[in-house]
Amino acid sequence: MNPNFLDFEQPIADLQAKIEGLRLVGNDNSLNISDEIARLQDKSNTLTESIFGNLTSWQIARLARHPRRPYTLDYLEHIFTEFEELHGDRHFSDDAAIVGGTARLDGKPVMVIGHQKGREVREKVRRNFGMPRPEGYRKACRLMEMAERFKMPILTFIDTPGAYPGIDAEERNQSEAIAWNLRVMARLKTPIIATVIGEGGSGGALAIGVCDQLNMLQYSTYSVISPEGCASILWKTADKAADAAEAMGITAERLKSLNIVDKVIQEPLGGAHRDPAKMSESIRADLVQQLDMLGKFDNDALLARRYERLMSYGL
């Protein structure tokens, strides 16, 4: 099985393998087989549209975790310029599961903060698989307060299974770190835009998710618990994860219908990992437009709007 394709994408993977095989044959023998390659590519695109037009909630959850999906640092490279990473919470240590720093978007200074999972084994371990400890959230809080002080908008990228539940994190008061971020973000006198780019897991996501504008990528998820965790509680087995995902309403379109999400950003055919540059350009365009819109509010109006937005949840 091709690791770049999930099991429900295998028919697409088979066609792509045939296309690559024909390209190799053409390169080796100087044969003109472009018509056959074009025919197979059209067939692959049609099949991809069919499969991705009927995804279940569980399939979307798995896409949100795809190992090739762009992470925060990938978007930082494509969307922003002059990124300068800042480290440490000034209390305990640095946390590589959250990256953040100053950058420029369309020439304007912004503060960018996001979860980072890591690709290779060593990096995954160093970044704790994108699960921040308290020092990660305290670092994020420090950067957000700095952004307010220097009148910079805050842009966050959410992609985490959840806050780290280990004993060391609990000893350093994980719940307090998350709660404090919620309190601070609700009162910051600067525009905040949050974008869920992969998994939006529980309080670990909310801790950098209180905002004036919430975006979700088309194949991202946002939930209070993972489908496997929910299934383990309700049915005593993770095998019911697909049923849990459907019942929980974790997808972008579902959350948009509930007015929890403000904007669903469409992904390239096959997901963001198929064309990171195109995905980045879509995000960049939306962020620029949204910052222009939020920039029209003075501080009092911005905070009032944020409060009303938060209080409208569940109504």
From Swiss-Prot:
InterPro entries in the cross-refs: Acetyl_CoA_COase_a_su (IPR001095), ClpP/crotonase-like_dom_sf (IPR029045), COA_CT_C (IPR011763)
Primary location: cytoplasm
EC category: transferase
GO CC annotation, single: acetyl-CoA carboxylase complex
Pathway note: Lipid metabolism; malonyl-CoA biosynthesis; malonyl-CoA from acetyl-CoA: step 1/1
Family matches, as PANTHER family: ACETYL-COENZYME A CARBOXYLASE CARBOXYL TRANSFERASE SUBUNIT ALPHA, ACETYL-COENZYME A CARBOXYLASE CARBOXYL TRANSFERASE SUBUNIT ALPHA, CHLOROPLASTIC
Similarity remark: Belongs to the AccA family.
Subunit note: Acetyl-CoA carboxylase is a heterohexamer composed of biotin carboxyl carrier protein (AccB), biotin carboxylase (AccC) and two subunits each of ACCase subunit alpha (AccA) and ACCase subunit beta (AccD).
Protein name according to UniProt: Acetyl-coenzyme A carboxylase carboxyl transferase subunit alpha
Designated gene of the protein: accA
